[in-house]
Amino acid sequence: YNPNPEDLKMLKNLSEEVIRNNADIGFAFDGDGDRCGYVDNNGNEIFSDIMGLLLARNFSEKYKSSKFVIDVKSTGLFGSDKILKSNDASVHYWKTGHSYIKQKTSEISALAGFERSGHYFFNKPIGRGYDDACLSAVEVCKLLDENPGSSISDLIENLPHTFNSPTMSPECPDNVKYEVIEKVIDMIEDRYKNKIKIADLEISSILTINGIRFTLEEEYD
């Protein structure tokens, strides 16, 4: 398989090794060492945005009023998390792509930037602003060390339950993909404006900085 933290074959192999060795956590590094994926102590994949949320919570306790940048594919839990809010942390959704997240993290002097593909950017005093998978793993190990009574699966279990899917990339020819995106944006914006429901739920907010992201009422995201 390709050394890709989002590759399910790679993560399955890592999961088997975590179980076989009774490990506390498994780390999946990509080929050039700037992305990291995760498997918990039970052998379950941890999506990178969820791990980013755990780290952001931990950082916000130490560095009050911190800023965090996340890509638009990330969980909506960032925007509703009570710990982040209690520590006066601010969350900024931005375009998908490691270069975009890196630039925005630097531009607004955010403490950290998390991209769902596994690129994490840490500014001082944690890091130096670039994506370093080894540093990501170190910070996760610190998180576990600072919570000696909890496994990584325990920490995740304490989060509100959400439903996630792997990154999906349907085939779309280059010469029509932007047209398709615009049509989808127009359709969702029309439903939002006219309060047309999706699965019996109204759209409560939309975000169009990179394609379109919409949130349904009752915080389904």
What name fits each language-model region?
Residues 25-26, 31-43, 105-114, 212:
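Self-splicing inteins and homing endonuclease
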